[in-house]
Amino acid sequence: MSYPTRAVRAVRLLSLLLCATTLTTACPLPAHALAEHTKSSSAGNNLTTNMDASHASSSSYTSRLALYHSIEALTGVPWYRLAAIDQYERTLTVAHPKDRKHAERIIGIFVTGPVWSGLLNPDAEDQNPRSIELFSGLGQDGSGDGIADRNNDKDLLFSIASYLGKYGNNEDEFGIAVWEYYHNSRSVQRVQQFAKLYQRYGKLDLVSQAFPLPLGSIYSYRSTWGSRRSWGGYRIHEGTDLFAGYGVPVRSTCYGVVEMKGWNPFGGWRIGIRDLNNRYHYYAHLSGFDKTVHNGDIVTPGQTVGWVGSSGYGKPGTQGKFPPHLHYGIYRDNGWTDWSFDPYPLLRQWEQSERKALKSGKTKGTSS
């Protein structure tokens, strides 16, 4: 039996390396791809966290915005797209804090060592830009110090921007770049929604909140999340019922993008709005919608999106199977699915904050 010479073995090894490197370049893994995702109901109950946009300080917003603009100047990638990816990554860390631990910094983007340095790189913590490039890693030196550090804000954001820039700058090309990074259509939708909000308002602190019903109207509510429901099969109640008369305005609780609008057999006429904390706000049993609000539209805190009714529990148009009320639900996206959690504490908080603001002569929404 003959054995290959050292030269032959070296050529074979080099061929395998080049092949694997090509595959890695064609399909970069998402920043969280190496983390194990588990579907636990407790993930959806993570109601408040310091990573939420609503808890960020004004100085943090200023620092982040300045960094986005500086990287835009270097790469040509619009700042609001960088902001959108950064914010989306923050929401993933909220959902998976144990899997996405990183040093405290301005930017919330999380990249694993192997993705940063290259999957075939023997040094998962490599910071040499040349060897990282050799192994098709994501990491680059954005600060000019000759080091590609995945915990350096400039290096991290410059690397993401450089990756995006390879695909082009129009909306479709941006969507393709995000898809190739995450391989998840939900991620593409979320990032594009966030970018749309940031582009519209030109700022990051879009954290104002409003109570879903006018405080001057007659209404009542209590915590009903988790109670049993039987229509259509036994299930738990994923929301809070706010009882009010027919036609009472239903208002957006947040800055967000309309994600869903139409009929649902359970919720009747309903509308769903996605906010920058990656929470889905669900308004159901409406008597109708504001006709100026459409799927994909941006809404603001306190904006009327519909009116209280009693629709649902049947085919389109079914009304009156229960007293008129607003079913308000809230869900958190963990990157793969939405998890319901009890909205009652937030409703109480928004109601009280808005009352205090009205008493002090302020009419705008308040931060949650």
Roles of regions detected by a PLM:
Residues 232, 308-325:
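Active-site loop architecture of trypsin-fold serine endopeptidases
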Residues 209, 321-368:
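Acidic, glycine-rich catalytic/binding loops that coordinate metals and/or anionic ligands
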Residues 240-242, 270-276, 329:
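Short, acidic/hydrophobic/Gly-rich beta-strand patch recurrent on exposed beta strands
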Residues 2-5, 10-70:
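N-terminal export signals and maturation junctions of secreted/periplasmic proteins
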Residues 253-295, 316-319, 323-324:
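Zn2+-dependent peptidoglycan hydrolase active-site motif and core
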Residues 193-269, 301, 358-368:
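Surface-exposed, glycine-biased beta-strand/turn segments
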Residues 50-201:
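Catalytic glycan-binding domains that act on GlcNAc-containing polysaccharides
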